[in-house]
Amino acid sequence: MSEAKNLFINGLWKNNSALVQLLGLCPLLAVSSTATNALGLGLATTLVLVLTNSAVSALRRWVPGEIRIPIYVMIIASVVSAVQMLINAYAFGLYQSLGIFIPLIVTNCIVIGRAEAYAAHHPVGMAALDGLATGLGATAALFVLGALREILGNGTLFDGADLLLGHWARALRIELFHTDTPFLLAILPPGAFLGLGFMLAFKYVIEQKRRQRQAQRSAVGQALRGAAPTDNHEQA
């Protein structure tokens, strides 16, 4: 398996930053009230991860080990500031909706964690791929949680998509069922904790079934290999 493929498998599933490492829970739980907000913050975090990993990797030979963490934080803060200004300029509605959670990307453990654990020890191309894979994994978790909360809470999907994609995206709004009274448990923070818990349990069940299938295939293979010499001896 190539290293690039392994990076994407780990980032999206095996070592997902949100569902396995449980990093960045503050924005994950606070912003995921709608699919649009979750997708917007996830894409912003992905862009920050790619740019930060690339910068850290490119500068790794000139960064003294004793002060590497403050330098990484300065790089992350610079990238986040640039991304924040881009969102403010081109998606002002989303900028207002996400509020303080855009600059809080600076303190996100996912970003500093990948810079320290991977980008500082690998070339620029692989570091950028690692940032992309990690960011897409976090975005997927954010989006699924946001979509579930929006559907259960308001009966809609992609409500406010125009904040992220422009006026044409209003056509993307789907009303799955009409409700005059939103389901507040899903919309408020307790719903975020419950939704994340169900997602963790679902991933655990899938992993357990996969391990059981692998164990069964391994047992069958060993049984067949053990039976082969016996069959050859009987034929002789």
Swiss-Prot record:
Topological type in the membrane: Multi-pass membrane protein
Compartments, as annotated in UniProt: Cell inner membrane
Keyword Metal-binding in annotation: no
EC assignment: 7.-.-.-
InterPro entries tied to this protein: NqrDE/RnfAE (IPR003667), RnfE (IPR010968)
Gene Ontology, cellular component aspect: plasma membrane
Protein's GO biological process: electron transport chain
Keyword field contains Cell inner membrane: yes
Root EC class: translocase
Pfam families linked to this entry: Rnf-Nqr
Region (Disordered) location: 217-236
Keyword entries, A-Z: Cell inner membrane, Cell membrane, Electron transport, Membrane, Translocase, Transmembrane, Transmembrane helix, Transport
Transmembrane segments: 18-38, 39-59, 69-89, 92-112, 128-148, 182-202
Subunit structure: The complex is composed of six subunits: RnfA, RnfB, RnfC, RnfD, RnfE and RnfG.
Family affiliation: Belongs to the NqrDE/RnfAE family.
Task of the protein: Part of a membrane-bound complex that couples electron transfer with translocation of ions across the membrane.
HAMAP family, alphabetized: RsxE_RnfE
Protein name: Ion-translocating oxidoreductase complex subunit E
Gene designation per UniProt: rnfE
